[in-house]
């Protein structure tokens, strides 16, 4: 994932969960075989089956925000594994308290309300077997949304902030469209155009690609000034070296 000469390699698998096909990521060290789930929204048996298939011991749950399709299985993972639940920002606790009630509206009945062991703040760091991940508070979709990223590994887990060709909804309670756009341009774009991201739903993309043609946050739309995106083959070469 990062510089292979100085840091352990990490593996990642993206596992769609819930009827909403939310992307849960499982990240683990191939040296210790310890790993974390990012945004375990539901389908606990499917998630634990994936961990068993790859021989991963789940030691943590990292949440980008409090919506039930991203956090609904966090408590179940902790109950089964003892994993520490980290994130999101404290401003999303009200959503974590409504997982069960909101799930009923979408026919998702296995979610559980949850309180994290630790909230995240802008600038915090997370670690998995010596590999450091940064945290950016990116409100807009929800007030307590965070993005978790590894800059040297050129990868980010953006939850529902950004998608291929779109951005997160802001018509939910306490959503704010302008705040969302500001979060993307001020917190994500400076990380670099070669950052590849796992969105909450749908396919992966790069920040450079979205700056080029996303109808909501392309540079031509926002007027953002910054480095232009790397050529696609350069991005692929970097990713091939960093993620194996």
Label for each model-derived stretch:
Residues 33, 101-104, 125, 131-243:
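Metallo-beta-lactamase
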Residues 40, 71, 180-184:
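Aromatic/hydrophobic pocket-lining residues that form the small-molecule binding cavity
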Residues 21, 32-35, 42-127, 131, ...:
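Active-site HxH/HxHxD metal-binding segment of metal-dependent hydrolases
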């Amino acid at each position: 994932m990062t510089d292979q000469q100085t840091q352990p390699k990490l593996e990642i698998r993206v596992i769609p969960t819930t009827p909403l096909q939310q992307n849960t990521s499982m990240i683990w060290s191939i040296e210790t075989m310890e790993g974390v789930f990012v945004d375990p929204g539901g389908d606990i048996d499917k998630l634990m089956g994936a961990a068993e298939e790859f021989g991963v011991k789940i030691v943590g749950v990292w949440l980008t925000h409090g919506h039930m399709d991203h956090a609904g299985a966090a408590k179940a993972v902790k109950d089964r594994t003892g994993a520490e639940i980290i994130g999101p920002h404290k401003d999303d606790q009200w959503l974590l308290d409504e997982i069960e009630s909101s799930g009923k509206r979408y026919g998702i009945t296995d979610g559980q309300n949850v309180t994290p062991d630790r909230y995240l703040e802008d600038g915090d760091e997370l670690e998995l077997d010596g590999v450091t991940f940064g945290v950016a508070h990116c409100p807009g979709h929800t007030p307590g949304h965070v993005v978790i990223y590894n800059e040297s590994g050129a990868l980010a887990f953006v939850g529902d902030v950004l998608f291929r060709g779109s951005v997160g909804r802001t018509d939910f309670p306490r959503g704010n469209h302008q705040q969302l756009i500001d979060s993307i341009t001020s917190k994500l774009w400076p990380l670099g155009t070669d950052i590849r991201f796992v969105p909450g739903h749908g396919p992966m993309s790069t920040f450079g690609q979205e700056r080029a043609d996303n109808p909501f946050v392309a540079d031509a739309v926002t007027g953002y000034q910054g480095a232009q995106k790397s050529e696609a083959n350069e991005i692929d070469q970097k990713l091939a070296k960093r993620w194996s």
